[in-house]
């Protein structure tokens, strides 16, 4: 199975937990306990049955994966990405996007000058932050708000940025 545009990243396994095969997962769902609620998860090669044991801080969960029964097996899953078919997810409003949909979008200034490419979307607790890699090789971060990103066109895979005044160098 290949991971393509029809799959959405819901989480990443970042550590083993305990000796009975549990793992810690950084989730990208609104409610971390929903990581396994949308349907079968896959890493691209196999389907994984995930059961959430507990929610811990910063959008993370401790989970059990069927067939993983010891710490060594759990440690082997570190950095494994967990995806779900987008057809299993709820429909979004017009101004909502999944993180994976934004990564790779071309970013332009209002005058159509290329500003860069979206390389990552973070959420440190106070809102989404978009990381953009510029043609000069710099990485810039901006709050993901409608004032800064007034236009997003998923058909053309482009978004418009109006950088805040304090960034001055982009005028």
From Swiss-Prot:
GO terms for molecular function: ribosome binding. The keyword Chaperone applies. It is found in: Cytoplasm. Keywords: Chaperone, Cytoplasm, Ribosome biogenesis, rRNA processing. InterPro entries: PRC_barrel-like_sf (IPR011033), PRC_RimM (IPR056792), RimM (IPR011961), RimM_N (IPR002676), RimM_N_sf (IPR036976), Transl_B-barrel_sf (IPR009000). GO terms for cellular component: cytoplasm; ribosome. Pfam families: PRC_RimM (PF24986), RimM (PF01782). Residues 94-168 form the PRC barrel domain. GO terms for biological process: ribosomal small subunit biogenesis; rRNA processing. Binds ribosomal protein uS19. PANTHER family: RIBOSOME MATURATION FACTOR RIMM. NCBIfam families: 16S_RimM, PRK14592.1. An accessory protein needed during the final step in the assembly of 30S ribosomal subunit, possibly for assembly of the head region. Essential for efficient processing of 16S rRNA. May be needed both before and after RbfA during the maturation of 16S rRNA. It has affinity for free ribosomal 30S subunits but not for 70S ribosomes. The PRC barrel domain binds ribosomal protein uS19. Belongs to the RimM family. This is Ribosome maturation factor RimM. It comes from Anaplasma phagocytophilum (strain HZ). The lineage of its organism: Bacteria, Pseudomonadati, Pseudomonadota, Alphaproteobacteria, Rickettsiales.
């Amino acid at each position: 199975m290949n991971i393509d545009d029809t799959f959405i990243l819901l989480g990443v396994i970042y550590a083993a937990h305990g000796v009975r095969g549990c793992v810690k997962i950084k989730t990208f769902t609104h409610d971390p306990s929903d990581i396994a609620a949308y349907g079968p998860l896959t890493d691209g090669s196999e389907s994984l049955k995930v059961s959430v044991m507990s929610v811990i801080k910063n959008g993370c969960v401790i989970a059990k994966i069927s067939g993983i029964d010891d710490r060594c097996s759990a440690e082997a899953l570190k950095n494994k990405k967990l995806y779900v078919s987008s057809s299993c997810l709820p429909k979004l409003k017009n101004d909502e996007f999944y993180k994976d949909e934004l990564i790779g979008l071309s970013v332009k200034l209002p005058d159509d000058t290329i500003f860069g490419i979206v390389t990552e979307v973070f959420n440190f607790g106070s809102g989404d932050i978009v990381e953009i890699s510029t043609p000069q090789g710099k990485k810039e971060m901006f709050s993901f708000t409608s004032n800064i990103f007034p236009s997003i066109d998923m058909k053309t895979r482009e978004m418009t940025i109006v950088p805040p005044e304090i960034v001055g160098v982009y005028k």
